Amino acid sequence: MPLDGVYDRLTDVGYAYGPAFQGLRRVWRGDGEIYAEVALPEEQRADAGRYILHPALLDAALHPLLPGVADQDRAALLPFAWSGVTIHATGASVLRVRLTLTGSDVAALTVADATGAPVASVESLLLRPLSKDALRQAASTARDGLFRIAWNTLPTTDTPTDTTDTTGWAVVGDLTVDGASRHADLGAVANADSVPDTVLYAPPVPDGDVPEAAHAALRDALSTTQSWLADDRTTDTTLVVVTRGALATREGQHTDPVQAGLWGLLRVAQTENPGRIALLDTDTDTIPTTALTTDEPQLALRDNTFHTPRLARTTDQPTDRPRWDRGTVLITGATGALGTVLARHLVTQHGTRHLLLLSRRGTNAPGAQELQQELTALGATVTITACDAADRHALTSVLDDIPAEHPLTAVVHTAGVLDDTVLADLTAERLEKVLRPKVDAAWNLHELTKDHDLEAFVLYSSIAGLIGNAGQANYAAGNTFLDALAQHRRALGLPAVSLAWGLWAQASTISGQLDQTDLRRLARLGLLPLSSADAMDLFDAAPATGEAVLAATRLDLGTLRKQGAH
C-alpha cells in the first residue's frame, strides 16, 4: 500500500510522531490480515540491544491500525489490553509484522526479525475506539505549548554592586556612564591606544516613518555589528548595545518597534558569536555602573531594577475571545501553507463566512483556486486577491473594497519569506527582502485598520526572534518588530497578539527549507514540530492568556534542562 505522506496525514488528525517513531516501511493488506515491515532509523539502531523490544519499533508495528494507513475508513483506536504475550528474541532493529483482525476491536500480533526468526507474539490485543475530537483533545498542546515572555527581577544574589570599576569602559552614543571614556564611534574605540574591556553603544534612531526608520536602523546595525565582529582588535571587548524603551517588560508599556528589531538581529549575533555582545534596554539615558557586573546576556533596566527575560507558562485570564463568525476576516500570505491551514480552520471550526485572502499571486498561486472552491462549498464567501500588503496604496485599495454589510472585523498577518545566512555574510539587500513582508506589511495593516472595530489583530511571528536562531538575523529582526508592534497596539488599547511560532510539521515556505540535519539540530535545541491541529489549538487558546506576545511551540523540556537553558 502507498505510504507517501502517511505520517503527515496522521499528524493532521492528531497522531504527531517524531522522526524516531516514523518506522513504517511497507504495508500489505490481505483478507482479515495486515502485513508490515517496520524499522528503526539508522541513528537509533545502536540502541536496539538495550531493550527487549525497542518502544519506537513496537509502536510502529501497530501503525497499520491507525486511521488511513491500511484502512481509509478505520476509526481512531488505541491499545487497551494485551494478553498472551510471548517474547522469543530481543534486540531487533527491523521487524516483519502480521496483524490478524479477529474482530472490529481485537487483533493478534506475530512479529519476526528481518531474517524471519520469531521475535514476539500477542494472542489478543484489545483496542478501544477514540473519537477524532477526543484524540485532538488528548493530543492538544494548548495547555503546555504557549509561553509568555516574563521579565523576572534579577535575584538579589545576582544583583550588581556599586563598586564597579569603569576605567576600562567606553561609551558611544547618547549615553552617560560615570567614569567611562567617550568616543565618537566604534571605529574610534578600535583605534584607541588601549582598547577598553567594555563598550556601551547606543545606536542612532533614524528619522522617518516607522518602516523607513526600522529599515535604516537595521541596515546600520548590520553594518556596524559586522565591522565590530570582524575586527581582531576588539575580540576581547564586550559590546553592550543599549536601546531605550524598545521592549515592554510588563503589560501596557509602550514600545519602540524600530529599536525592537535590533534585538532580533543582535540575539542572532549573540548566538553566532558567544560572549561578544550583550543587550540592555533601559528607561533612562544614564546607565548605572552596576549594569554589567552580571553574566546575563540580555537585561532590561526599569526604575533602577534589573530584569531578565525567561519563557514562562501562561495562565488563562478573564478575557473575551474573538468572534470569527462576524464580518470579514482578512488573512495575508493566505495561499501559503500556514495561511491555508488557518483559512480552513476558521471556516470549519469557527463558522467564518466572509474571508478576504491576500497573497502576492492571488488566484494564480498554486492551490488557490482549489482552496476557494473548497471553502465556498463549506458555505463561506471567499475572495482571493493579488495584493502585496507591504504596498500601502494597493492595500488601501483592497480595504476600501470591503462591502459595508460585511465590515472588516479581524486581521491575521501570516506573510513572510526567508533568506538565511550567517550574519557575517548577510547583505543589506537580503535584509530588506525579509523585512519588507514583516515590517512594512504589518505596519500598513496596523495603520490602515486601527480605526476599525476589530475583534482580533494577529501577527504570525517566529521564535527565531526570541531565541536568536543562528543564520536568521534578518528574519529574527522582522519578527521582533512584530512582537513590539503587538505590544504597541495593546498599549494604545487596540487588540493584538503576536504568535512567535516554533517549528511546524506542515510543509511550508519556511519549514520546507529545513533538511533532516536542520530538524535534528532543532531537536537537540529542544524544539519539536507542531502538527497543524495542535497549532490551531494554540491559535484558539492564545486570546485567553491575555498576553500580547506568546511563543507557540512544542518544547522538549528535558532537553532544555540538560542544556541548562532558561
Predicted features, each with a name:
Residues Q317-T319:
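N-terminal flanking helix/linker immediately upstream of nucleotide/cofactor-binding cores
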Residues M1-P297, R302-F306, R321-A565:
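4′-phosphopantetheine-dependent carrier domains
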Residues R313:
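Glycine/aspartate-rich loop-and-adjacent alpha/beta segment that forms the canonical ThDP
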